């Protein structure tokens, strides 16, 4: 969270944490938010492979992958997060989702759909 942003009610900023327990509680809260957002993203990936099946499109679209990485790096820089960290995380996530899409597409094609 940017230093000038106000914390939502009940949420401590890093500077407001007075103990390691409070820091860990906030990290756990942030982790829940991250997983919830990954679940939301996965819903879109789920829809993407269905559309790709209809359009006979590939799961792996390198230009799109790079476009996503470039956007994430820019957002990271704006937020003061190391762009290399976010790129590494997103490349891992994109790779996992590509494999997921490929398995789904292969399963549907083999099933004759």
Task: Label every PLM stretch briefly.
Residues 1-113:
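Domain-level signature for soluble enzymes in the chorismate/prephenate branch of the shikimate pathway
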